[in-house]
Amino acid sequence: MNGIIPLWKERGMTSHDCVFKLRKILHTKKVGHTGTLDPEVEGVLPICIGRATKLAEYVTDEGKVYVAEITLGKSTTTEDATGEIIATKDLAEISPEALQSVLTKLTGKITQIPPMFSAVKVNGKKLYEYARAGIEVERPSRQVDIYSLTRLDGLASLNESNPTFQLEISCGKGTYIRTLAVMIGELLGYPAHMSKLERTRSGFFKKEDCFTLSEIDEMMQANDLNFLYPLEKGIESMTKLIIDDEIHAKVLNGALLPKALFVSVENESRVALIFEGKLTAIYKPHPEKKDLWKPEKVIELNEA
């Protein structure tokens, strides 16, 4: 079995739980997810099966869309609703214009510091391991892309009796929505946290494309594999090059290819090679031999 499943991860499960259960449902060990979702978050989680596991990094690199509920006036240890409250402040009136001004400032390339309760590694240990031991460590900042921030709940002012608002976030990989909630609060002059989160899109998969674990289980029992998308779905945004029989045979053996073959796509950092409509391999310019391209991943098996 090879392909990509757009899974709807339900609240209360870890991403690893989903992989474990799918291995049992699909009767295959080669299962990998494409970016962790916290247990209390539900949403789109593309799962790579079989040879598609070689594409996981490309699927992960694609943009994401989230719908978050952000609460002003309270901050927590984890930056979400699961943590202990560490700061509070009564809200004065915050106009929709003031909020929009902050959202505009945080659109584009921004710098984030990952939360202490996260899986980012420092000196070989995950940050949440330090946090659980009560140890604060210096966290590396990272630049992330925020493509758009759109308020979804109308234009009401925020105040003590109405401290929450809904926000749709379109962003690049590595963005912490919890941290974004805190940053919005800081610019407004208030403690804040992310009180709810749902991922409505991951790469090329939307909420309406998804299947739950129970739906996949039922479909498997009925020998219905319509939950499985072809490998080519994972490289939709990648530049493609059609190859012939002769080149195909070389690619299956992991051969270096002449740069002249890639003249139409020479400005690309990687190219998907397609033979008879199927993804065969992903190639990139050779770092030392400037007249050659080399395989980054050979996807199709050489069964000769």
UniProtKB/Swiss-Prot annotation:
Top EC class, one word: isomerase
SUPFAM superfamilies reported for this sequence: Pseudouridine synthase (SSF55120)
InterPro entries (UniProt xref): PsdUridine_synth_cat_dom_sf, PsdUridine_synth_N, tRNA_psdUridine_synth_TruB, TruB_C
Record's protein name: tRNA pseudouridine synthase B
EC number: 5.4.99.25
Keyword entries, A-Z: Isomerase, tRNA processing
Xref: Pfam families: TruB_C_2 (PF16198), TruB_N (PF01509)
Catalytic activity: uridine(55) in tRNA = pseudouridine(55) in tRNA
GO biological process, one term: mRNA pseudouridine synthesis
